[in-house]
A protein has these predicted regions:
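Acyl-donor (CoA/ACP) binding surface of acyl/acetyltransferases
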Residues: 1-32, 49, 65-179
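Active-site rim helix/loop that mediates acceptor-substrate recognition in acyltransferases
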Residues: 37-62, 67
Length: 179
């Protein structure tokens, strides 16, 4: 099941990945864009237990969460997520979370591009979208590099820690991103 790109391997999480996930999920700088507090190591362990074998793709909320690592190193650099939003309309949400130490190297774009190909070519997704904080410049660049268009600006649609957040919605149709 692993997905290989030029530089990365995308694979299901295993119990051995708890510390790797916690290394980025435990950071406030990462969690702020997810509108939630940083995760504890124990929360990461529970999450991995839940998602490690979650490969069902039938109803709203079913998700494929893959660990991302480089070919040349065993540590996890982040994760990519594909969540079924509407089975009847073949729509899914794509997302990514990267350890800040690995930002700016194109890993998020490379991993998201590979997961988008799986969504369109293997899972039959027609429309893929991403929701991201308007201040998340890195994720905005990833969406643009993928060829997604900005479809919406949701103003103060979420609130975390007493602060309102706004989101952009980017999307693309299968025929627009297939090469």
């Amino acid at each position: 099941m692993p997905i290989r790109t030029d530089r990365l391997v995308l694979r299901l999480f295993t119990p051995d990945d708890v510390d790797g996930m916690y290394a980025y999920q435990g950071l406030a700088s990462v969690a702020r864009y997810l509108y939630r507090p940083p995760r504890s190591r124990e929360q990461c362990a529970r999450l991995i237990t839940r998602i490690a074998d979650a490969t069902r793709w039938e109803r709203k909320g079913d998700a494929l969460v893959l660990a991302v690592r480089r070919h040349d190193a065993p540590e996890i650099v982040g994760e990519v997520i594909l969540t079924l939003d509407n089975a009847g309309a073949a729509q899914a949400e794509i997302g990514w979370v990267l350890h800040p130490a690995y930002e700016g190297r194109g890993y998020a774009t490379e991993a998201a591009r590979a997961l988008a190909a799986v969504a369109f070519d293997r899972l039959g997704v027609h429309r893929l979208f991403a929701r991201l904080d308007v201040e998340n410049a890195g994720s905005i660049r990833v969406c643009e590099r993928l060829g997604m268009r900005r479809e919406a600006h949701l103003v103060e649609n979420d609130r975390y820690d007493g602060r309102w957040g706004s989101e952009y919605v980017y999307a693309a149709l299968a025929h627009e991103l297939r090469h």
